[in-house]
Swiss-Prot record:
Site (Transition state stabilizer): R16
Sequence positions that bind substrate: R16, D17, S170, H199, Y290
Name of the molecule in the record: 4-hydroxy-2-oxovalerate aldolase 1
Metal-binding as UniProt keyword: yes
Gene name of the record: bphI
InterPro entries in the cross-refs: 2-IPM_HCS-like, 4OH_2_O-val_aldolase, Aldolase_TIM, DmpG_comm, DRE_TIM_HOA, PYR_CT
EC numbers, comma separated: 4.1.3.39
Length: 343
């Protein structure tokens, strides 16, 4: 099937998911510079918050260089055409955080839950719609549910008022056929006017291929990040995805060379380490582990001497999900004790 002429919305993750590899330490000036570049390149939606969403500043998730309010207040006035979104995970972010974001000018709220827990999003989705926001239901770790199970959860979020549903490959575990099955069945089940999106990670180097598969299956919003700046091996690299779309005739409204310049000149220089598919990031995708667990596992390796890869495989075996970051150190300690007993 030709996708020529299909119009999609590209949603930038560099300033939210990109907070994870930066340990939430992006400066206000860096935020402004990158946001202005994205805006000038034609990116229509830019997400700005702590990596774990509004209210994410904590011992469990990490303390950012600045508050969500400061980041949003720095970015929003700089933009000429792009709109700003914010992520909110019920249980981390509250309705008061949502009201704050709305008051500052955020136009899109993405309410994120584990892929089996859409029911916890009802209050936040309902309030967002009442406030007149573009309201997205964001089903994380979607590889852990079958297409039929995702349909049930997506329809719940739609019933609460979400005007867009996201299928989210938080672990970068899916292959194109997995994406096609999930996006296709959810698209068939939702109202025609409800939009559908896909969020990918590059842990198996499938970010671009999976995003194209999502578009072919009916998604019209796609997440990506300049230079792939995001958790694990990064999000779908936007400059590559936009170039592929351009080759295929998919209309993104984003200038290929301008977004490449943003990636090369603004994003790459702020990286603490290259965003690449090393053995630990590959293990995330292979074992189906939440991408933001990567640095937690690397820190546990440095502390306890257990290879991060072994820790990540164990986390995958335990089927840990986002929000269980405190269990990573527990798993490492258990592995240390087991090795001491075996010695």
């Amino acid at each position: 099937m030709s996708l020529a002429g299909k119009k999609i919305t590209v949603h930038d993750m560099s300033l939210r998911d990109g907070m994870h590899p930066k340990r939430h330490q992006i400066t206000l000036d860096q935020m402004r510079d990158i946001a202005r570049g994205l805006d000038a390149a034609g990116v229509p939606l830019i997400e700005v918050t702590h990596g774990d969403g509004l209210g994410g500043a904590s011992v469990n998730y990490g303390f950012p260089a600045h508050t969500d309010e400061a980041y949003l207040s720095a970015v929003i006035p700089e933009l000429k055409q792009a709109r700003v979104s914010a992520l909110l995970l019920p249980g981390i972010g509250t309705v008061e955080h949502l009201r704050m974001a709305h008051a500052l000018g955020v136009g899109t709220i993405r309410v994120a839950t584990h892929c089996t827990e859409a029911d916890v999003s009802e209050q936040h989705i309902g309030l967002a719609r009442t406030l007149g926001l573009d309201t997205v239901g964001f089903l994380m770790m979607a590889h852990m549910s079958s297409p039929a199970q995702l349909v049930v959860q997506a329809k719940l979020m739609e019933s609460y008022g979400a005007n867009c549903i996201y299928i989210t490959d938080s672990a970068g575990h899916m292959l194109p056929d997995d994406v096609t099955a999930r996006i296709g069945q959810v698209r068939d089940a939702l109202k025609p006017e409800t939009e559908l999106g896909f969020h990918g990670h590059h842990n198996l180097a499938m970010g671009v291929a999976n995003s194209v598969a999502a578009v072919a299956a009916g998604a019209n919003r796609i997440d990506a990040a300049a230079a792939g700046l995001g958790a694990g091996a990064g999000n779908t690299p936007m400059e590559v995805f936009v170039a592929v779309c351009d080759r295929m005739g998919i209309e993104t409204g984003v200038d290929v060379f301008a977004i490449s310049d943003v990636a090369e000149d603004l994003v790459v220089p702020i990286m603490d380490a290259p965003i690449r598919l090393d053995r630990d990031a590959l293990t995330l995708g292979y074992a189906g582990v939440y991408s933001s667990f990567l640095l937690f596992a690397k820190r546990a390796e440095a502390k306890y001497g257990i290879p991060a890869r072994d820790i990540l495989v164990e986390l995958g075996r335990q089927r840990l999900v986002g929000g269980q970051e405190d269990m990573i150190e527990d798993a490492a300690l258990t592995m240390v004790r087991a090795r001491e007993v075996a010695a």
